[in-house]
C-alpha cells in the first residue's frame, strides 16, 4: 500500500490489514510510507502493517539528511530485507554509510518539527487556493495524512506559472525557469520545481505535475513556514494574477 497523498489513511490501513489477514493469515502487509511520517499520532506498523519503508530526503530526514532510506517493522522481515539488499550473512552489520550518520540522526531528531512546518504550509496553500476558486485535496479543514496538496490548475499556463513561482522563491537556483520535459514512466511531459539544498528533496518546498488535462499540480514540503508562505504566495500570483 502507498500512503502518499492520502492513498491509504491510517484507518484504512487497519481495515485492509484485517481483511487481508482474514483471507490469508500468512500475508505480509507492506506500506510505502513516503510523505506520511509524523503527520499522525500513529505510524502504519501501529495500524496493522508488517513492514514500512520511506525516504530520508522526505519527512524523516528533516531536510538535513542528504540521502538514504529506512526499513522498519517486524524484526524477521527487516533482517530478510537487510540480507537481500546487502549480502547474506552480513545483513545490517556491515555496509556503506557515506559519512552521513550524523546528518541522518540530526535530521531524524528535527523531523517532527519540520513536518509540522510543512503541514502549516499545506494548510496555508489550501486556504489560498480556495480563495482563487480551486479545490485542493485535502482541504485546509480536513485531516492531513501526509504533506502533499494537489489541485487542478485547469490550464497548462497556470500549472507552469505555479511551478515557476515556487522555483523563483526557492533558496537554490531561484533564477531557473522550469520547463516541461519528457520523464521516464510518464506518457506526457512533466514540469517540476525544486530549488532545494538536497537534490530531489520533497520535504523542502517543491511541486510538479504532468502537462495533461486537468493539469493537476502536486505541492509538498516546506522546511519553515515563513519562507514557504512566500513561495506559495508567489506561485499563486504567478499562476493566476500575472496580468
Labelled PLM ranges:
Residues 1-9:
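Single conserved hydrophobic/aromatic residue that forms the stacking wall/gate
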Residues 10-42:
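Catalytic PLP-binding core of fold-type I/II PLP enzymes
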Residues 18-28, 45-50, 75-80, 87, ...:
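Secondary-structure boundary elements
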Residues 29-33, 51-55, 138, 174-178:
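General beta-strand structural signal in soluble alpha/beta enzymes
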Residues 44-60:
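Conserved active-site segment immediately N-terminal to the catalytic lysine
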Residues 45-46, 70, 86-87, 164-171:
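Short, solvent-exposed amphipathic alpha-helical segments in soluble enzyme
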Residues 57-158, 235-243:
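Active-site C-terminal subdomain of aminotransferase-like
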Residues 130-242:
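Conserved C-terminal alpha-helix-loop-beta "cap" of PLP-dependent enzymes
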Amino acid at each position: 500500500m502507498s500512503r502518499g497523498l492520502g492513498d491509504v489513511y491510517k484507518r484504512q490501513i487497519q481495515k485492509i490489514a484485517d481483511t487481508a489477514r482474514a483471507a490469508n493469515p500468512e500475508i505480509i502487509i507492506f506500506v510505502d510510507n513516503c510523505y506520511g511520517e509524523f503527520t499522525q499520532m500513529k505510524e502504519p506498523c501501529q495500524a496493522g502493517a508488517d513492514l514500512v519503508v520511506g525516504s530520508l530526503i522526505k519527512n524523516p530526514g528533516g531536510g538535513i539528511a542528504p540521502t538514504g532510506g529506512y526499513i522498519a517493522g517486524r524484526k524477521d522481515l527487516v533482517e530478510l530485507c537487510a540480507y537481500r539488499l546487502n549480502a547474506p550473512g552480513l545483513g545490517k552489520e556491515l555496509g556503506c554509510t557515506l559519512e552521513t550518520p550524523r546528518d541522518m540522526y540530526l535530521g531524524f531528531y528535527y523531523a517532527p518539527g519540520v513536518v509540522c512546518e510543512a503541514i502549516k504550509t499545506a494548510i496555508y496553500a489550501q486556504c489560498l487556493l480556495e480563495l482563487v476558486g480551486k479545490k485542493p485535496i485535502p482541504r485546509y479543514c480536513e485531516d492531513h495524512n501526509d504533506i502533499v496538496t494537489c489541485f487542478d490548475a485547469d490550464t497548462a499556463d497556470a500549472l507552469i506559472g505555479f511551478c515557476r513561482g515556487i522555483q523563483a522563491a526557492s533558496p537554490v537556483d531561484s533564477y531557473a525557469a522550469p520547463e516541461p520535459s519528457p520523464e521516464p514512466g510518464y506518457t506526457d511531459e512533466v514540469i517540476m520545481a525544486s530549488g532545494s539544498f538536497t537534490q530531489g528533496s520533497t520535504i523542502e518546498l517543491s511541486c510538479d505535475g504532468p502537462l495533461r488535462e486537468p493539469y493537476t499540480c502536486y505541492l509538498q514540503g516546506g522546511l519553515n513556514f515563513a519562507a514557504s508562505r512566500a513561495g506559495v504566495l508567489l506561485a499563486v500570483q504567478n499562476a493566476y494574477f500575472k496580468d
